[in-house]
């Protein structure tokens, strides 16, 4: 579905599934505010939430596009925002559920992940917001040798483990426990489960 916004005589177009109408309208508002005075910055990267978007000319209109995070193709720009808007929706829902909405810390597609050996080969694993910039992911079973550690960027791992999108903006020192692809609990800095 096309969502259209008129800005200073220019038509901005954003494409997304109808179920993301609220998120699409919010995204258009963000882009509109950015470009109200900056039409010379068309085709410039605009950081927002997990990633970045840009506005490109399309005929006489302007199309809002986003990097292809779903398929890990950062050099490819897509018109359909559904995948990106779903990421935004999930993080906001998690912020509300864990009562951390006003304390969420940005984490971007190029953010570092440190992953312990064998993590995704076991059923039970955890993710720890080590600091504002880094997540550490490891098996819960401490008898499994975590070495060697592997460094990745979020966009390389998150599409295969989309449950990580939900929790990526949680505050520093929060720990999330998983069974398979399901979040089992979210422990705050006082080790209180704020998920259940």
Question: Over which residues does each language-model region extend?
Answer:
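Acidic, proline/glycine-rich low-complexity IDRs
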Residues: 1-196
């Amino acid at each position: 579905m096309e969502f259209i916004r008129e800005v200073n005589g220019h038509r901005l177009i954003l494409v997304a599934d109808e179920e993301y109408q609220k998120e699409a309208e919010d995204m258009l508002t963000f882009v509109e505010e950015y470009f109200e005075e900056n039409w010379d910055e068309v085709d410039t990267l605009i950081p927002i939430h997990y990633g970045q978007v840009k506005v490109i000319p399309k005929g006489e209109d302007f199309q809002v596009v986003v990097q292809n995070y779903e398929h890990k193709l950062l050099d490819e720009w897509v018109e359909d925002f559904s995948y990106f808007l779903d990421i935004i929706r999930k993080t906001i829902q998690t912020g509300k559920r864990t009562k951390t909405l006003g304390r969420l810390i940005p984490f971007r597609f190029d953010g570092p992940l440190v992953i312990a050996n064998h993590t995704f080969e076991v059923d039970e694993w955890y993710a720890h917001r080590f600091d504002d910039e880094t997540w550490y992911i490891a098996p819960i079973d401490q008898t499994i040798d975590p070495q060697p550690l592997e460094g990745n960027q979020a966009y390389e791992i998150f599409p295969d483990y989309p449950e990580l999108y939900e929790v990526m903006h949680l505050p520093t020192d929060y720990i999330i426990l998983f069974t398979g692809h399901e979040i089992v609990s979210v422990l705050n800095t006082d080790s209180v489960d704020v998920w259940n």
